[in-house]
């Protein structure tokens, strides 16, 4: 369940400011700036593993005595996780011993870190055993449940992952990433109706994020039928309304609303294939989508991709059907 999914524009600006400050420090190590950067990342629940492992490791090994006691150990945990993300299994062992000497081997926070280290070494059975023992004492421990889901997913045991994720969402009902993860599991099983239920929970909690309207439209399209195709068009169109293409000329990269344009074309084409009498507004929308798709592709893509898009438009053309 990605923690970067909910990164806001203000968070992004703040992170860039911190990173630029660290880079501009040159050869000197500004431990205060690094401390503040890691503190911001913890508070925002954002993982920047390369940054944290590179600078945080030096912070906790050479400047640990300058950190407040609680923050120092919080930072150690943060650095351990970042190092594991980056494939470093040596430094986490040293830092783990420091945690264990402070809190004891039976501490829940120490057990969590131990399980993460085991998991990163592919000792999954041992890691699951620790997470299970934690949950027996603390049934609502979020990290243990999330790691169980991740392990079961990695093993291809989606039914078990769904079971744990359902239990997790009974406690943490507003976790958007968890609902998105659960919807993807159900889509893997072609359970589109159940996936839509999960995505409804996402839309209720994030009604202005255009990406989630695209995600909701996709299972609707997969279900098929005139009603679902019509609904899919509406959700794809609303995604465009929330992520307006009006300033496309100012972009130096392909716009992010392309999936919505593709979705509109496929949904309206499928309606036509079903013999549905298209409305005038749908015909105009189809024409607009085709024209914009071709314009965008010509601006940002090579000739090979342009030819592919032209072929796609020709194969889904409803205006010159024989």
Swiss-Prot record:
Keyword Transmembrane helix annotated: no
Q: Name one Pfam family in it.
A: TPR_EMC2
An example Gene Ontology CC term for this record: EMC complex
State the Gene Ontology BP annotations: protein insertion into ER membrane by stop-transfer membrane-anchor sequence; tail-anchored membrane protein insertion into ER membrane
| Location within or outside the cell | Endoplasmic reticulum membrane
Instruction: Tell me the membrane topology, using the record's own terms.
Output: Peripheral membrane protein
- InterPro entries the UniProt entry points to: EMC2-like (IPR039856), TPR-like_helical_dom_sf (IPR011990), TPR_EMC2 (IPR055217)
Q: What residue spans do the TPR repeats cover?
A: 108-141, 143-175, 176-209, 210-246
Task: Provide this UniProt record's keywords sorted from A to Z.
Answer: Endoplasmic reticulum, Membrane, Repeat, TPR repeat
UniProt subunit comment: Component of the ER membrane protein complex (EMC).
Family in the record: Belongs to the EMC2 family.
- Name-wise, this protein is ER membrane protein complex subunit 2
Annotated organism of origin: Dictyostelium discoideum (Social amoeba)
Q: What is the lineage of its organism?
A: Eukaryota, Amoebozoa, Evosea, Eumycetozoa, Dictyostelia
């Amino acid at each position: 369940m990605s923690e970067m999914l909910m990164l806001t524009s203000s968070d992004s600006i703040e992170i860039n400011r911190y990173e630029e400050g660290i880079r501009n420090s040159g050869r000197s190590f500004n431990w205060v700036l690094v401390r503040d950067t890691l503190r911001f990342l913890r508070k925002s629940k954002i993982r920047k593993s390369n940054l944290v492992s590179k600078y945080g490791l030096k912070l906790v090994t050479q400047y640990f005595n300058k950190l407040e006691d609680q923050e120092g150990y919080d930072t150690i945990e943060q650095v351990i996780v970042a190092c594991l993300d980056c494939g470093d299994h040596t430094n986490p062992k040293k830092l783990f011993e420091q945690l264990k000497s402070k809190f004891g081997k039976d501490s829940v926070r120490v057990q969590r870190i131990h399980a993460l280290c085991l998991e990163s070494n592919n000792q999954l059975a041992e890691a699951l055993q620790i997470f299970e023992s934690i949950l027996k004492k603390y049934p609502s421990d979020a990290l243990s449940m999330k790691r169980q889901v991740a392990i079961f997913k990695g093993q291809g045991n989606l039914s078990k992952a769904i079971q744990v994720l359902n239990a997790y969402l009974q406690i943490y009902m507003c976790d958007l990433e968890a609902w998105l993860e659960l919807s993807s599991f159900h889509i893997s099983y072609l359970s589109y109706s159940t996936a839509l239920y999960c995505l409804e929970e996402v839309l209720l909690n994030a009604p202005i994020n255009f990406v989630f309207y695209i995600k909701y439209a996709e299972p609707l399209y997969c279900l098929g039928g005139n009603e679902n195709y019509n609904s899919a068009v509406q959700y794809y169109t609303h995604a465009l309304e929330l992520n307006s293409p009006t300033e496309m000329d100012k972009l130096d990269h392909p716009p992010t609303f392309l999936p919505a344009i593709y979705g509109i074309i496929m949904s309206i084409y499928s309606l036509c294939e079903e013999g549905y009498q298209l409305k005038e507004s749908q015909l105009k929308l189809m024409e607009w989508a085709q024209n914009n798709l071709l314009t965008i592709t010509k601006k940002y893509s090579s000739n090979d991709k342009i030819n592919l898009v032209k072929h796609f438009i020709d194969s889904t053309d409803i205006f010159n059907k024989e």
